[in-house]
């Protein structure tokens, strides 16, 4: 048996198996050969003709694609080279597989595994290496039979699925027809086409039962209509049916509106919860402005008289501080303050002194970390009747400091301690070595060496007059608690803010001893006074050790004479011009509530407290009066 007879027998079986109309398959199989090399293309054509295939050749991939598109049913197999100039063989493979669904055999001289794998993954049914042999081309017909069998199976599966779907539709149509027949008996047409109507209704019901309801997407415009409808009805009276009527939108059901309304109510509830939580936090921290809520968290320090919110930092109002200082109840003592109200002159320099704990006071406004440097002036009608344009400067306190020299600049430096609410004036070592020559005990630096500029020479030696009553050098200055401070222009009478107000302690309170030496120096209207003193006081006993009182003639800059006093311990002395501290001050058992705030309204923050070697707290700050 020859090869041709064997091929004819196989072809006959193939034709009968494939159901084709041709005899002796694969004789006459239509093959399209594509190769850019004319020699290879000619050899391939001769081999295909020896296999009795119907061959069509072309040297360009674009031409081959054009032939396939024009004659879709005129070819059974495509043999294409991989590397071509106008189009890659893999690209042609993809296009043929997508558009014509024909088996494609790749032909190349490159037999690398990656190249072969690439051709197979792109849909090639076989990959042949050059030069092609006749035995390989004689068996290429099997790819055509395999593709036809796969198509037949797919068609059979599609037919079976279609028949099943048709059966289900028929059952649904029959069920729907029965229902519609019952319902359509009452609504028959005038023409009597009951059967047609029932069939149409059954078809519609069958289609609606199999179709899936479209999902509603709430766009921005749709949500705006929903919100407008809810606002029009009110959130309490809004129901899905009314909202749907007001929206007047197609393809939206009542269930869709009900679901969206539930989500919208949950959203509003969450917003109200967040707003109430923020309001509660703001109320708990006491913050009026939400930007300062974090600052209000330090409100617990108010119990210790340390910090308080600063209302303003521009100027000090007399209503906040001085009015409370005028009343004895503000300090918890009686009889200390003079009946005349305290007046504060206009500040000409910046406030730059920490007055946080001067004299144990903690009321008023606070200015953070500031040192007060201001010129306090008194009224033109001053309390010194014999001084017309002098420059006496005094600080209200219990005693006066001794004098060192005259006709020098006077710079008053008072170092304050604010380690606790019961802090008093604490100084530091003298900054000028040649000035530290006295160690007399005192409480507040008071310049008493005052040089008259020649305007009036009739000043008494040691007697000062304030508002009429005669004031003795020691007792009057100690008991009056009000000494004017005068500048070049007498504008206001000011009580010293640095006075140490004695405070009543509990019996369990340990003594607070403060020791320091202060070197002060002020310049007032070309009058120069030097003072250097130290502090050594026990507050519970309110004792003054070795007090010295300056006595001088206030004329032409003569130096005063420092005369020692008798023992300064104050117990139960009944002096007309001197206060009884133990009787008046021990009435209270602690700081009153009005004193706890102190000068916190002036200074926002205290300086950082440090510790000396002996454990006495102090603050390295100063108060400078220029």
From Swiss-Prot:
PROSITE patterns given for it? Answer: HTH_MYB, RESPONSE_REGULATORY
The listed locations are: Nucleus
Gene3D superfamilies referenced in this protein's UniProt entry, alphabetically: 3.40.50.2300, Homeodomain-like
Q: Where is this region: Disordered?
A: 1-22, 151-215, 402-440
One annotated GO molecular function: DNA binding
According to its UniProt record, where is this protein mainly located?
A: nucleus
DNA-binding residues: 210-269
* PTM: Two-component system major event consists of a His-to-Asp phosphorelay between a sensor histidine kinase (HK) and a response regulator (RR). In plants, the His-to-Asp phosphorelay involves an additional intermediate named Histidine-containing phosphotransfer protein (HPt). This multistep phosphorelay consists of a His-Asp-His-Asp sequential transfer of a phosphate group between first a His and an Asp of the HK protein, followed by the transfer to a conserved His of the HPt protein and finally the transfer to an Asp in the receiver domain of the RR protein.
Swiss-Prot/TrEMBL keywords: Activator, Cytokinin signaling pathway, DNA-binding, Nucleus, Phosphoprotein, Transcription, Transcription regulation, Two-component regulatory system
GO (cellular component) term, any one: nucleus
| Record PTM 4-aspartylphosphate, positions in chain | 81
- Cysteine pairs bridged by disulfides in the record: none
Basic and acidic residues bias: start-end ranges: 151-162
Q: Which InterPro entries does the record cross-reference, listed alphabetically?
A: ARR-like, CheY-like_superfamily, Homeodomain-like_sf, Myb_dom, Myb_dom_plants, Response_reg_B-typ_pln, SANT/Myb, Sig_transdc_resp-reg_receiver
- In this chain, composition skew of type Polar residues spans 402-421
Positions of the Response regulatory domain: 30-145
Q: Which domain of life is it from?
A: Eukaryota
For this entry, list what GO says about its biological process.
cytokinin-activated signaling pathway; phosphorelay signal transduction system
**Listed Pfam families:** Myb_DNA-binding, Response_reg
**What happens biologically when this protein's gene is inactivated, per the record?**
Dwarf, narrow leaf, lesion mimic, low tillering, late heading and low fertility phenotypes.
Q: Where is the composition biased (Gly residues)?
A: 9-22
Family in the record: Belongs to the ARR family. Type-B subfamily.
Q: Matching NCBIfam families, A to Z?
A: myb_SHAQKYF
Query: PANTHER family of this UniProt entry?
Result: TWO-COMPONENT RESPONSE REGULATOR (PTHR43874), TWO-COMPONENT RESPONSE REGULATOR ARR10 (PTHR43874:SF7)
Q: What does this protein do?
A: Transcriptional activator that binds specific DNA sequence. Functions as a response regulator involved in His-to-Asp phosphorelay signal transduction system. Phosphorylation of the Asp residue in the receiver domain activates the ability of the protein to promote the transcription of target genes. May directly activate some type-A response regulators in response to cytokinins.
Descriptive protein name: Two-component response regulator ORR24
Q: Which organism is it from?
A: Oryza sativa subsp. japonica (Rice)
- Lineage, top ranks: Eukaryota, Viridiplantae, Streptophyta, Embryophyta, Tracheophyta
